[in-house]
Swiss-Prot record:
Annotated LRR repeat ranges: 62-93, 123-150, 172-197, 218-244
Taxonomic lineage from the root: Eukaryota, Viridiplantae, Streptophyta, Embryophyta, Tracheophyta
Limits of the F-box domain: 14-60
Annotated ranges, domain FBD: 362-425
Alphabetical list of InterPro entries matching this protein: F-box-like_dom_sf, F-box_AtFBL13-like, F-box_dom, FBD, FBL13/AtMIF1-like, LRR_dom_sf, LRR_FXL15/At3g58940/PEG3-like, LRR_PRU1-like
SUPFAM superfamilies per record: F-box domain, RNI-like
Name of this chain's protein: F-box/FBD/LRR-repeat protein At1g16930
Pfam family for this entry, one: LRR_At5g56370
CDD domains: F-box_AtFBL13-like (cd22160)
Keyword vocabulary terms for this entry: Leucine-rich repeat, Repeat
Amino acid sequence: MDDETSVKEKQRNSDRISNLPDSLLCQILSDLSTKESVCTSVLSKRWRNLWLHVPVLDLDSNNFPDDDVFVSFVNRFLGSENEQHLERFKLIYEVNEHDASRFKSWINAVIKRRVCHFNVHNEVDDDDELVKMPLSLYSCERLVNLQLYRVALDHPESVSLPCVKIMHLDMVKYDADSTLEILISGCPVLEELTIVRDPNDSLEVVCVRSQSLKSFKIDSERYESQNHVVTIDAPRLEYMNLCDHRSDSFIIHNIGPFAKVDIDVIFNVEYNDPLEPDDSSKIAMLGKFLTGLSTVSEMVISSDTLQVIHDYCKMEQLPQFSNLSRLHAYFEDTWWEMLPTFLESFPNLHSLVMEFDCFPDTEQIDLSYVPQCFLSSLEFVHLKTPYVVNMQKEGRPLTGTSSKRKLAKYFLENGAALKKLTVSASFCNIIDEIKAIPRSSTSCQVVMD
């Protein structure tokens, strides 16, 4: 009897769901993947074609037995008479010029349905075969999120994307330098922009001008071509990540006054060919770049960038970073002599993380000068050696003992505001010595992570 009651209860619940209006059922199905949504068509006649009216199309061609089945499926969905707005469209597919006509008809159909979230991931390998997006993409009035991977963009006469807030352009090729600039300028409420550059793209200038942009990331691997420029004018920018070993010039006209930045750039300066006094144009550009960053509140800086700054400091004085409260810097063992002068540029520094690949086996490092932040603001210091934490387990000696001791002593004896010094596990052989060092701040703790 209990089993019969349970079966009837399940039937009643099933009927309740089936009796819901189409609009609500489609909203429920939109939380499923398209594959799962289609599976509901076998439940009953009521559900047979319901998936065609779901405002989401999320498809990966790799989940289909062959290309013909995939094409037929997409054609059926987009070729239906349904004109309901699409909330999300995601397509993972290998598209080349041979498929261009069919692909563009799909995209035009999606744009006609006023899509909000648009994501095309092209799996083609040949750069010469990248399919061009239709020009209709530049006037999609409801579009909020645009993500493109390995496609080509034609030069537009105009762009009107009034609702786009998020744009990710990954390995995209542009018809001209101005293509990207016009695209960005046509997004008046854009807040998040990510650009991952194709090594073979033809861009010489990446120009980012936006009054609304809050987050900007660029990722560009090293490439032989030179004279590439990145220029940024985004007065509301709150976060910027420059990971670019390709461009040799960075021009910051404007960013937010308390932005957070992550900098890994080399300005086309080779490790074995450092900056020289006669590189006047490069030195001037570096000075303007650093001045453009001088209002930030938090900064992560790579060892490659710090190498260039190390060379720059031999010829010019760093600007004052008066707003900077948090700094995470990756140091090479040969740049320690710049540490006091470097930290003098951060008078209000609150937290410092110094990360090292290794420590030099020497005490011949001058750490006598005490920066202003040691006396008034620096409360937290973390000395990290992430690549040698397991050296003892691997049977390798812990190197740089004397320099580790000297560095820890430098912070403890001079850090009048210091509350905590954290050292990595590679300090384990001298941790007791470090804890015994007299401290300028009586409230300072020494801990090992």
